[in-house]
Amino acid sequence: MQGIILAAGRGSRLGHLTEKKPKSFNKSGKKRYIDTIIDNYIINKIKKINIIVGYKKDLFKKIRGKKIYNRKWQSSNIFYSLSRAEKILKSDTCIVSYSDIIYDKEAIKLLVKESGDIVILNNVNWKKIWKIRFKNPLDDLENFNYSKRS
């Protein structure tokens, strides 16, 4: 099993917080987002870590994991970034994470235990959280449809 962290973008909506560093270098408490994600992978025995980088790629040099460069990071989207890891996705089971969303180590543990072809974590209370950020929560929300298991 491998981890893929999507960290190519700048996070320009964060303004001055990403002028000198990628959004994944911002902190929750005393720890950078990227470090928390990697630590949660390692705790769950995901040793092969791949990071798709772009903006400020040199800042990622000392971070554990293989770096995969998206040279089109300014003009492409998250799916293009993910396509940079196509060989890995085709050859191994992978957990894919955004670099600016922190998942609890227990959430990663749940993903590791699942056996479906595609498994997605979701928060059933998403709307309450997104209403804090946006008047219309659907303005900036990535979404998916799902059916419950029987």
Kindly label every feature range from the protein language model:
Residues 19-24:
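Short alpha-helical oligomerization interface
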Residues 99-101:
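The conserved acidic donor/metal-binding loop of glycosyltransferases
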Residues 63, 105-150:
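Conserved core of the sugar-phosphate nucleotidyltransferase
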Residues 12, 103:
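Active-site micro-motifs of SAM-dependent methyltransferase domains
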